[in-house]
Curated annotation (Swiss-Prot):
Domain of life: Bacteria
Regions that span the bilayer: 5-27, 34-56, 61-79, 92-114, 161-183, 391-408, 412-434, 455-474, 484-506, 513-532, 547-569
Matching InterPro entries: AAE_transporter, Asp_Ala_antiprt, RCK_C, RCK_C_sf, YidE_YbjL
Main location: membrane
SS bond partners: none
One Gene Ontology cellular component annotation held by this UniProt entry: plasma membrane
Example of a GO MF term: monoatomic cation transmembrane transporter activity
Keywords: Cell membrane, Membrane, Transmembrane, Transmembrane helix, Transport
One family name in Pfam for this protein: TrkA_C
GO biological process entries: potassium ion transport
Family: Belongs to the AAE transporter (TC 2.A.81) family.
Protein name, as recorded: Uncharacterized transporter FTT_0829c
Amino acid sequence: MFHEVILNVLKNPFIALFLTLSLGYLVGKIKYKTFVLGGISGSLIIGVIIGQLNITISPDIGSLFFALFIYAGGYQGGAQFFRSLNKDTLLLLASSTITCVLGLLCVLVFAWIFQLDKGTAAGLGAGGLTQSAMIGSANNAIAMINSVSESTIHTMQTNVTVGYAVCYIFGSFGPIILLATIFPLVMKWDLRKEAIKLATEQSDGNLDLEVGQFSAFSEYTTRAYKINRDSQLLGKSLVEVYKTYKYKVVIKNIIRDNKLLTITPETTINTNDIVAITFYADLDIQSIISKDIEVTKPEQFNFIEEKRSLILTNKNLFNKTIKEVKDIIQDRNYYGVFLQKIIRSGQKLPISDDLKLRRGDEIRLIGKPEDLDKISNKIGTFISEAPITDFIFFGLGMVLGYIFGLISFNIFGISITLGAGVDCLLSGLIFGWIRSIKPQFSNLPVGASNFIRDLGLAIFVASVGITAGPQAITTIKEHGLTLFFLGIGVTIIPQVISFYISYYLLKIKNPIVLLATIAGGRSVNPGFAALLERAGNATPVIPFTSSYALANIWLTLWGPVIVALVTIIPK
């Protein structure tokens, strides 16, 4: 009875999914030396096992969570993707084409050696290369054969489905192991370190820090000094200090006679004052306070600073240099703020006095809230730093993604669609790019996008395993292991050859770029998910997107090509 209760509980698709998720990531922690199975591989294995209970998972569940996963991944890489479209992208497309062509040749060679019929060969290609669209294109090509009976056409179309089912499991699982474990192990790559390194290069040297890490160096520092009678600061007002040292030194607080003063721009500095000075870390502060004595921070110095981002909308500041802007907005008042960075179209600009500002530039300032309040309305629109999701644009992004999925076009009479992956991926890229150039719109905080991405891929892989589990065992029993092992060959051989061609001949040397390109050329979503998990950031998105889009077209076209070139027809 207890056994029946457990079975009935597991029949609930949501219980099965989340149990697969939990056990899969538990199994994924298995480690042997440098080999780590990983949560994605673990979820696929556990899903196949739990799938033996014939649990029905609606395909819409997997599709929805995959759409969420791929949208979040695209969003995170959107800004960098559109900036990276250059001649180097041609190498990625060449690698993708090589992978696809090698896959086709592998299928044709196996079909010739093992005397496979048109349908089985097409199924071998669809499953081993994990391209379900190939089923449709192959079936359409088979239906157009006029020289055979309808029953033979039906048999060949059935063989397409059977071949796909037999080969699909390893077609999904194999790239996970190859891309996320075997290749990095052979090449002695640490994917997380390589991803951080690549992200740093793409962000002009800004470190991609892991949770718990922080930079040991700060752009600004605050120290306390006691003013001597021969100090350079003695007798100066706070606004004079600010302007004398070109806005690089700010007096934040003053203690006089053991009392914290309420300071104004006109407040002057007296002998024996204890002042809190904030200054740029690269400033030679000793040349300014050489006559003064540094002291430990008094208890009265407990002021709070804030970082604030503004979009330049004040037309009086358009096309003005930074020096001119400083002179304009600091003309009569002491504000005590620092310019931290300027971002234009998603890219950080080097700050110099002669840099001209443009409408829509994002200006990031640092200072006390009351000082920032004074200056903000003279620059433009405030952008909230709160980690709040803009559900207006998130909803529009998903809608646009599904609309993209409805688009189809014909190549040589074959209907091609963007597919379940490219649609929301493309939408995510667009809305991530919008966020980079218009930061007041389309906010999806890093924490939220990471959660959507990770949960989406985990549920997607779990549903794939549960759904494919029963059919995989059944078809292997019915059709033997030959087709299964041929599928392994179709999955592994093109990837291995393409990997070395891309690395040594095409000179794609960056590990993350190379592995993501191979994943895209194989049109393998679980493999990309595993790579994304190991990378820990969005660096694989850009190369994957380029090669994935082209591979979808090539692999869909291979269906009719296989049907045309394989000559055997079942009796």
